[in-house]
Structure formats: C-alpha cells, structure tokens
Regions:
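Mg2+-dependent prenyl diphosphate-binding active-site environment of isoprenoid biosynthetic enzymes
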Residues: 39-128
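N-terminal amphipathic/basic leader segments beginning at the initiator methionine
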Residues: 2-39
Length: 128
C-alpha cells in the first residue's frame, strides 16, 4: 500500500535534494518503513523477518542503490519511482549477501555474526 501510494505521487522528476547522501537516506527510510513498520504490522513473530531486520540494521556501502539512483537521474525518472527502484536494487543485493554467506560458510558479515550463524541456515535461506 505504501509503495503504491508513493508511486502514485510520483509525477515530478524534480530532484529536491542537496547531495546523493540525502537520497540514500530517503532510500533507507523507505526500506525501514517497509520492514520495520509495514511488515511488523502483519507479522511480529516471523523469524525470517527478524533475520532480515537483523541484516538490514548493519548497512553496507549501498553501491548498487547509488548506481541505480545515478542511472535514474540520467534517465529523468520521477523522484519517487527512483526511490522505489533504488530500494529494490539494494534489497535484492542484501538478499544475495545472505545467500552468499550461507553458500560460502562465512560466519561474519559487517563485523557481526552472519544471518545464518545467528538464526540458522534454514531461516537465512528463507530470509534471503
């Protein structure tokens, strides 16, 4: 519902921000809203959701989201659409990292136990 509302409001390609970091903050806010507010309202006891939240609380460099934002700006994509696309790119990459850790047996991700190490391989696979 939130994303549909955001997409409907997306009529302008005017970028009202002072730096790319401002937009990354908005992308992070969108991801936070999805997983920490919207999903919480639906499922408070799902271990896979808890594993996703755990992973997202230690963000990386967000390179893929930044590349997506850059491409969207070059293509004059509407601002809200740009946020949705960058959030999707970042979430897809984060999911791949969870699976990568399971596959490689890496126990640490971003200076904390990898999702599979904390929640188990089955939960990590579902979370990713």
């Amino acid at each position: 519902m939130f994303i549909q509302t955001l997409a409907r409001q997306s009529t302008s390609s005017m970028y009202a921000f002072s730096s790319p970091d401002d937009v990354i903050q908005e992308v992070n806010s969108l991801i936070h809203h999805i997983f920490f507010e919207q999903v919480n309202a639906v499922s408070k006891t799902n271990l896979s959701i808890e594993a996703i939240k755990y992973h997202l609380l230690s963000p990386g460099q967000q390179f893929r989201a930044k590349v997506c934002l850059d491409a969207c700006m070059k293509l004059d994509v509407a601002y809200n659409d740009m946020l949705i696309l960058a959030a999707a790119a970042e979430l897809l990459h984060e999911a791949s990292l969870i699976h990568d850790d399971v596959q490689d047996g890496d126990e640490i991700r971003r200076n904390q136990p990898a999702v599979w190490k904390k929640f188990g391989k089955n939960i990590a696979i579902c979370a990713g």
